[in-house]
Amino acid sequence: MNFIPDNKSKPFFSLYYEKDGYDIKGKRIMGRQAAGWSFLKSIVQSQKYSRLGFYLKGAEQQKLLKDDVLTLLNNNNKSIELEYLSHSNVDLIESYGGIMLPGPDLTEFANSRAFYGHNRYSLCGITHTTASHSVMSSISNLLTSPIMPWDALICTSNSVLQTVNRILEAQSHFLSYRYNKKLDFLPQLPIIPLGINIDEFHFDDEYKSNSRKELNIEEEDIVIVFVGRLSFHAKAHHVPMYTALEACAKELSGKRKI
């Protein structure tokens, strides 16, 4: 296992790496981190690329990145070269075409790019939670940041796109009223659902049976899985789920266990 490639193939973008966006070992693992790690894993393990560019903010992040890449290359017959980028290394970033960010906040990166030329490279962010104050602020700030039409904010569903558009429309109306000027520069908002590696979700009947036994779940019992955080202010409100479970429990009372 090493970092010396056989060729110089590389993707059409570099990745912004900060450990928090890809960390699945902490006590409070969030969906954005699981998605970030899965994306990093797919890029590193892909046989398509032997050279990857990473936009970093210091030596500490560089070490953490190298550790993560070594972990992902473990038992994987592949060599890869890591190219480290900084905000001032514009020519190198430009050679990749752009920077892929693990979150929706493009403002800081757009401000850094502005010193060297808006058209030097693209920025591409992605949404996860959209109902938190910080994320809504990041989205509304797109209207007053040096964002260009060749930038993008990936929306992971139709509902996310609707949310993003409502935030932008509300902020646009406010700014038009405040400054008597319509702001037209917005990023592209493509809908690209999060993907998964289906090969990681193959469980045989023995595994399923043992898992149910460990949780004391009988064969006829019904298992309800809520995928996500029970957070009323930043995720889906949990009351509708509780109401539905209550209705199911009453209907199946004495018949099957939920």
Where are these regions (language model features)?
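Helix N-cap/beta->alpha junction signal
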Residues: 57-58, 102-105, 156-159
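N-terminal pre-catalytic "stem/leader" segment of glycosyltransferase-like enzymes
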Residues: 1-93
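Short helix-capping segments at alpha-helix termini
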Residues: 73-77, 116, 174-184, 248-256
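Short hydrophobic "strand-cap" motifs at the C-terminus of beta-strands
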Residues: 126, 156, 192-195, 226-230
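Extended catalytic core of nucleotide-activated donor transferases of GT-like folds
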Residues: 61-146
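Well-ordered, non-membrane alpha-helical segments in soluble/globular domains
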Residues: 29-41, 62-68, 169-173, 209, ...
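Conserved catalytic-core segment of nucleotide-activated headgroup transferases in glycan assembly
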Residues: 197-258
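Donor nucleotide-sugar binding/catalytic pocket of nucleotide-sugar-dependent glycosyltransferases
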Residues: 148-210
